[in-house]
């Protein structure tokens, strides 16, 4: 039965939002205890979770489903511009290709094992946005568009947009089950 299949998507979205909020909290409040590898993984995971939500509400391939869910939950895409940023989503989905290109370019630097060159390499990773990179001093996450132009994603915007989505889902849930 298709009745209220929308809430299957709602559960999925709620789980993504739950993990987004946990990651933002960990990145923000526990950053002194996070080792660099975990910091990178958390940053990349945050981008992936945001992309998952965007794919539900703003899918090009499943436009009808996306439009139905947006209408069903009364979600204004204008209120979630950070989440549905297609440039960020597209680049994040092709992350492996960017890393392949980068690793080819950087293999010479890594083979020399010059610490100054390695530091420059780390700087390039951060400035070119080759990874999801959280800048916690400025409360933001960086990614890049397909032309490698930096995209700045404010963590506070992500929190506000995900709270808005949760609110819209809860309103609909209470209308159906008062």
Identify the function of each model-found stretch.
Residues 103-113:
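Short, surface-exposed loop/helix-turn segments at secondary-structure junctions
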Residues 1-81, 111-178:
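Amphipathic alpha-helical interface segments
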Residues 98, 107, 166-168:
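Surface-exposed beta-strand edges and their flanking turn/coil or helix-capping segments
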Residues 79-104:
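Histidine-centered, metal-coordinating catalytic motifs and their short helical/loop contexts
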């Amino acid at each position: 039965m298709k009745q209220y299949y929308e809430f299957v998507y709602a559960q999925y979205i709620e789980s993504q939002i739950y993990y987004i909020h946990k990651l933002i909290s960990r990145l923000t409040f526990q950053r002194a205890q996070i080792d660099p590898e975990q910091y990178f993984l958390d940053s990349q995971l945050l981008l992936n979770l945001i992309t998952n939500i965007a794919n539900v509400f703003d899918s090009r391939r499943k436009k009808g489903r996306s439009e139905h869910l947006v209408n069903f939950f009364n979600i204004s895409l204008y209120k979630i511009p950070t989440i549905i940023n297609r440039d960020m989503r597209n680049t994040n989905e092709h992350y492996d290709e960017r890393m392949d290109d980068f690793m080819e370019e950087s293999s010479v630097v890594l083979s020399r094992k010059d610490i100054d060159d390695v530091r420059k390499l780390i700087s390039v990773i951060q400035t070119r946005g080759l990874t999801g990179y959280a800048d916690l001093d400025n409360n933001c996450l960086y990614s890049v568009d397909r032309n490698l132009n930096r995209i700045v994603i404010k963590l506070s915007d992500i929190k506000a947009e995900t709270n808005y989505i949760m609110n819209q889902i809860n309103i609909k849930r209470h209308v159906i089950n008062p």
